[in-house]
Design a protein with these regions (language model features):
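Alpha-helical structural modules in large enzymes and assemblies
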Residues: 1-308
Length: 308
């Protein structure tokens, strides 16, 4: 049996994949353990593997978690493009709603308004002509398994409760400044260097206390398009804006001080706590029982060595 990822946020989907892929061997294993060793836990697990309802339920969960884990990996990445990460999050949120919400109603909502969408009256039923999308694997197994219609509908209701709770939990975790984060797309190098690009005024006006001269910001924003930037700086958005920030005119003065300061300030917004979790994980490795009396400075020094 393949080992699971030690990282806790990756283990759940992999656990479901292993259970489903090794269903029959695991079922046989626990049956033998229950009969030969008279193990109560093995008997409980064997009873769970005997029930096709559990397998049907896990097939639905696997379908749902694939997209969730994909986006979660993006947030765990240290090199994610912050201008696209909010779009990925909302795309995942919409894909979850597409499973259970009427598509005609959902299509009328723009991406930035998805967090405020009240869809409670547009939830699809589990039976009928237009139903919740339970997935191909779920439907195939439902047709071939020995469950009756009532049992299958019971599983479908469980799946419906799961997806609605997942949508609710994701909604509670969406950032309050979602519209501001969506605006960060305009700072992508491809948009910045385009002759036909989005105006900087809507986002700049929100930070007028820090950047009062909107006209100067707009002039710098338009002038960036006429500079031939080196191809090396297009590899990522941080490299690009670092290059813009260092660009000088003939007298050695920075040519884009305001727009680069605005862009770098917004691009430094935290979008994930993954780096903090990594530090705490490293601290747990460093701060063992033998090192329990280490002072804070010593722990900091060891962490800095590990993080280099």
């Amino acid at each position: 049996m393949p080992g699971l990822a030690a990282t806790r946020w990756l283990a759940r989907l992999e656990a479901i994949n292993v259970i489903l892929d090794e269903w029959e061997p695991l079922k046989l294993h626990f049956e033998m353990a229950a009969s030969k060793e008279r193990c109560y836990t093995a008997q409980e697990l064997f009873d769970a593997y005997k029930d096709p309802q559990n397998r049907l339920y896990l097939l639905f969960i696997r379908k749902v978690l694939k997209e969730v884990v994909r986006v979660d990996k993006i947030f765990q990445s240290q090199n994610a493009d912050i201008t696209k990460i909010t779009d990925d999050l909302l795309d995942m949120y919409r894909s979850l709603m597409q499973i259970v919400v009427d598509s005609h109603y959902l299509s009328k909502c723009t991406k930035e308004n998805l967090p405020d969408l009240n869809f409670i009256n547009y939830i699809l039923p589990v039976t009928g002509n237009t139903t919740i999308n339970f997935g191909y694997d779920f439907n195939c197994f439902a047709q071939s398994c020995p469950l009756n219609k009532e049992q299958i509908n019971h599983v479908k209701e469980r799946c419906k409760s799961f997806i609605l709770e997942l949508i609710n939990q994701v909604k509670h975790r969406l950032p309050d400044n979602i519209k501001t984060l969506l605006m960060l797309k305009i700072f992508s190098p491809s948009n910045v260097t385009s002759q036909c690009k989005t105006s900087i005024v809507p986002i700049a006006s929100q930070y007028r206390s820090s950047f009062p001269d909107i006209d100067e910001l707009e002039n710098e924003w338009k002038s960036i398009s006429y500079i031939q930037w080196p191809q090396e700086c297009f590899k990522d958005i941080v490299s690009f804006w670092a290059e813009v920030n260092e660009y000088t005119n003939s007298s050695g003065e920075k040519k884009f001080p305001n727009i680069s300061a605005l862009a770098l300030s917004l691009l430094s917004l935290p979008f994930s706590n993954a780096s903090i979790e990594r530090i705490f994980s490293q601290m747990n490795v460093v701060h063992t029982d033998l090192r329990n009396r280490l002072q804070v400075r010593s722990v900091e020094a060891l962490l800095q060595i590990l993080m280099v």
